[in-house]
């Protein structure tokens, strides 16, 4: 199978207002149905056979399942999605029938009050009901993504126990919990209020690993054994009961040499790197032009990977691709300096 996969941000709209996100300031113009279908065709013309639907909130897109069925008809062999889980209870069967093979669900707390505080909506029960519906009605692998912050790090064991209980009930490896470091990816984190929030809530990889010691031996495993291999993720086994993942790009200084993601933004831009200075408009082009543009970008990225497989790359213009809004200029050392000033000069990253 082609190493490349299409990461398709199909809408910038979202019904949550997470404290670490920038959804209020997103440029939210959606692509036309014809452009979406032609992008799917153009990627397929370049040998891409995997797709990951994102947003915004992809299930906020009314006809998302129609596009998934179209992708299935074109020959996409694997379809996955990242969602906040709010609509899952109502959409589980449709997603299953549209070709979904696995799903990432963003969930940062099991506490109802804290959930409302983090996402701005009283909807924890909706998300948990959605997870339960997916477990009962589909065979999808479920990856729960928890953004770990100072405010919720004490819940790490709750998430692991939740996965252990459900894996016993529905089958081994139905749920994988992934702990995501709160790292700078948002223009708001360059403003005074956002900067203070990030510095205060930032958690290191070591902090996460220390919370796992109560489960005994932690064994790192080959990430390629995990369905939906992500080169940025490290996976571990805990007592042979559960697989967990850790994404700590900030602690690792942004390794990106193995990335094969063709990214489409909700604003109709295409790139092969979130931190690339070259962001191309793909909407409005003919199918032939879309196919040619994707071919050129993939070829460019392959040459970069061939030259430097251990490449590390962090670009300063936060949010330009994710949110359609560019932040101030800054580099990774600026963020390390923020942490030193906020937490002490000897702080770990």
Q: Where on the chain are the PLM-derived regions?
A:
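A short acidic, helix-capping loop that chelates divalent metal ions and anchors anionic groups
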Residues: 26, 111-118, 186-191
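Canonical Radical SAM [4Fe-4S] cluster-binding loop centered on the CxxxCxxC motif
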Residues: 1-34, 273
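Radical SAM/AdoMet-radical enzyme domain recognition
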Residues: 33-53, 57, 61-180
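Residue-level recognition of short loop/turn positions
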Residues: 17, 55, 267-268
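Conserved beta-strand segments that form the floor/walls of ligand-binding pockets within enzyme
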Residues: 5, 9, 22, 52, ...
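Accessory C-terminal segments flanking Radical SAM cores
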Residues: 184-322
């Amino acid at each position: 199978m082609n190493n490349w996969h299409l990461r398709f941000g199909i809408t910038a709209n979202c019904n949550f207002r997470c404290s670490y996100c920038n959804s209020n300031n997103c440029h939210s113009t959606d692509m036309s149905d014809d452009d979406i279908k032609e992008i799917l065709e153009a990627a397929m013309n370049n040998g891409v056979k995997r797709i990951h639907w994102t947003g915004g909130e992809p299930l906020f897109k009314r006809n998302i399942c129609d596009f998934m069925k179209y992708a299935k008809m074109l020959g996409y062999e694997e379809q996955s999605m990242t969602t906040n889980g709010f609509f899952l209870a109502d959409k589980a069967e449709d997603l299953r029938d549209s070709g979904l093979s696995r799903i990432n669900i963003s969930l940062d707390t099991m506490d109802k009050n804290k959930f409302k505080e983090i996402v701005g909506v009283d909807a924890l029960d909706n998300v948990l009901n959605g997870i339960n519906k997916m477990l009962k009605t589909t065979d999808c692998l479920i990856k729960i993504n928890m953004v770990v912050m100072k405010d919720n790090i004490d819940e790490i064991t709750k998430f692991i126990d939740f996965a252990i209980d459900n894996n016993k009930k529905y089958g081994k490896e139905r749920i994988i919990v992934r702990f995501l470091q709160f790292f700078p990816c948002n223009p708001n984190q360059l403003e005074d209020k956002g900067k203070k929030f990030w510095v205060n809530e930032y958690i290191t990889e070591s902090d996460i690993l220390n919370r796992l010691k109560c489960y005994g031996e932690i064994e790192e495993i080959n990430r390629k054994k995990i369905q939906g291999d992500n080169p940025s993720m490290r996976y571990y086994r805990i007592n042979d009961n559960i697989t967990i993942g850790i994404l700590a790009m900030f602690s690792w200084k942004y390794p990106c040499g193995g990335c094969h993601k063709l990214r489409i933004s909700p604003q109709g831009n295409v790139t092969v790197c979130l931190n690339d200075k070259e962001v191309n408009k793909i909407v409005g082009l003919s199918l032939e032009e879309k196919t040619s543009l994707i071919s050129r970008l993939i070829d460019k990225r392959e040459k970069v990977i061939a030259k430097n497989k251990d490449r590390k790359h962090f670009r300063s213009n936060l949010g330009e691709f994710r949110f359609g809004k560019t932040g101030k200029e800054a580099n990774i050392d600026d963020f390390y300096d923020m942490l030193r000033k906020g937490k002490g000069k000897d702080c770990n990253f």
